[in-house]
């Protein structure tokens, strides 16, 4: 028998999906594979390779290679330096970030807050700076299944009042698999380029696979 709590969570996520699906300009998919490796001195290394499709799932958008070095300060508190190399049809874009995150658990719920300052590099263009703040709520349904919900804000850095440039709302589920691997299935609604007259509203459906070395 399915527990009422699980049913309520399912209805809530379905409601959010329906609410954010109206007035959508495009639909994308993000699929990725990655690995994690613990290193000495409380360090860890992560790598992810991702493919993104746009134009109602019909056109190549970009492929992303990202490597990240993280340091565990104390339990729950981490500092990270991610580097991203993204290849588009007509350009190459690089990004370097400095981030910090803190996770607090009170079973079966955990809260995670992440802040990140990122700088994007693109040939013959001015460097772009953004500040990102993200809150993630995770619920432990079982030892292997964890639904989650998150919200994220993107602010332009060093502009008038650090203007809001984009926001994202996401929900999904992380599932632990055998042999130190896991998958994550997720949906993202993102409203980007908010400084423009007509911001872009985009649906994203994603799947990621991660394994630990």
Predicted features and spans:
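Residues that define the transmembrane beta-barrel architecture of outer-membrane proteins
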Residues: 27-29, 61-63, 92-96, 127-131, ...
């Amino acid at each position: 028998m399915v527990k009422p709590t699980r049913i309520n969570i399912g209805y809530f996520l379905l409601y959010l999906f329906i609410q954010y699906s109206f007035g959508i300009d495009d639909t994308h998919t993000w699929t990725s594979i990655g690995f994690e490796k613990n290193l000495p001195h409380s360090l860890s290394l992560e790598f992810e390779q991702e493919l993104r499709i746009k134009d109602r799932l019909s056109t190549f958008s970009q492929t992303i290679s990202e490597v990240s070095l993280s340091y565990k300060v104390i339990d729950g508190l981490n500092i990270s330096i991610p580097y991203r190399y993204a290849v588009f049809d007509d350009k190459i874009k690089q990004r370097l970030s400095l981030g910090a995150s803190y996770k607090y658990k009170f079973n079966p719920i955990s809260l995670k807050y992440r802040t990140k300052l990122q700088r994007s590099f693109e040939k013959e263009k001015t460097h772009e700076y953004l500040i990102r703040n993200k809150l993630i709520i995770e619920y432990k349904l079982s030892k292997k299944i964890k639904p989650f919900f998150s919200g994220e804000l993107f602010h332009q850095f060093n502009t008038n009042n650090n203007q809001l440039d984009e926001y994202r709302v996401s929900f999904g589920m992380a599932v632990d698999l055998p042999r130190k691997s896991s998958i994550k299935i997720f949906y993202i609604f993102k409203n980007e380029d908010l400084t423009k007259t007509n911001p872009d509203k985009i649906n994203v459906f994603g799947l990621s696979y991660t394994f630990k070395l």
